[in-house]
UniProtKB/Swiss-Prot annotation:
Species the sequence originates in: Streptococcus suis (strain 05ZYH33)
Chief location of this protein within or outside the cell: cytoplasm
Keyword Cytoplasm part of the UniProt annotation: yes
UniProt keyword annotations, A-Z: Cytoplasm
NCBIfam families reported for this sequence: PRK02302.1 (NF002631)
Recorded family membership: Belongs to the UPF0298 family.
Superkingdom of origin: Bacteria
Disulfide topology: none
Residue stretches in coiled coil: none
The protein, known as: UPF0298 protein SSU05_1549
A GO CC term assigned to this protein in UniProt: cytoplasm
Record localization: Cytoplasm
Amino acid sequence: MFEKKNRTCLTVYLHYNRDARKLSQYGDIVYHSKRLQYVLVYMDQELVKATILKLKKERFVKKVVPSYIKELDQNFVGNLWRDEEPSVVG
């Protein structure tokens, strides 16, 4: 049976676009912005902290920013999977 893995995204800012290929060993490259010189890399959640430390040591990397989407409150009006709260009106 298929088991869902927790994955997260890292935004890696580069000095040069030609170094984007080197990031494929760290995870799945989803998007590469050539104008703003960053790459979105998806990887398993348990590998993130070790990978951030490795990437910060690389000379071709300017900055590494993890995704904060899991920490945001996603319980808002219009969300299909939000917790149902009793209505005040009805």
